[in-house]
């Protein structure tokens, strides 16, 4: 189950990036461009998938037996735990700040509609000023997305490859789908 959560969340999280870069670099964030609305909606949906799946993923992590720790020093184990909790923080911060920074009419995804944060009772109850609130959330979303998320994700991938190609342990194998893991074991 942990592997399924891992790959669905990782796929959704990673796919948000080419969409965001296409919107910014190719469409120049032009809201009138024909592809802007479908791409930004897909970016948003993928972010919400990450946010909605990270809760059961965290519950699974907390209430189930963790896999056996890979060989390594105490420092490596501490760094591994910090990196994993950093990934969980990213899986919450990125989609949450993305949602909190949206305004305007509800987004119609055809299967459901999602009310944007400033139109919610919570926003009204908190008595927030959108002109003050939105730029702060937007800066967090874009700064973390551009500078921190890529670093942490690439560090995670590098660590998996390090375990596989340098340490020759099963850390990478046990997180891959069974057929891929078996193929790598045969090599």
Can you say where each PLM-predicted feature lies in the sequence?
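Membrane-embedded alpha-helical bundles that constitute the cytochrome b-like, heme-associated redox core
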Residues: 1-187
């Amino acid at each position: 189950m942990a592997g399924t959560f891992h790959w669905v969340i990782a796929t959704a999280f990673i796919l948000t990036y080419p969409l965001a870069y296409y919107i910014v670099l190719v469409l120049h964030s032009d809201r009138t461009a024909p592809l802007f609305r479908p791409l930004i909606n897909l970016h948003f949906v993928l972010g919400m998938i990450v946010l909605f799946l990270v809760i059961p993923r965290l519950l699974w992590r907390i209430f189930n037996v963790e896999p056996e720790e890979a060989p390594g020093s105490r420092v490596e184990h501490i760094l591994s735990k910090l990196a994993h909790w950093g990934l969980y923080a990213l899986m919450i911060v990125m989609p949450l700040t993305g949602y909190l920074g949206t305004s305007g009419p509800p987004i119609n995804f055809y299967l459901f509609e999602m009310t944007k944060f400033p139109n919610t009772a919570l926003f009204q109850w908190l008595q927030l000023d959108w002109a003050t609130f939105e730029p702060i959330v937007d800066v967090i979303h874009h700064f973390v997305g551009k500078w921190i998320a890529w670093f942490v994700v690439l560090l995670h991938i590098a660590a998996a490859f390090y375990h596989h190609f340098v340490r020759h342990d099963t850390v990478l194998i046990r997180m891959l789908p069974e057929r891929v893991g078996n193929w790598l074991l045969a090599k």
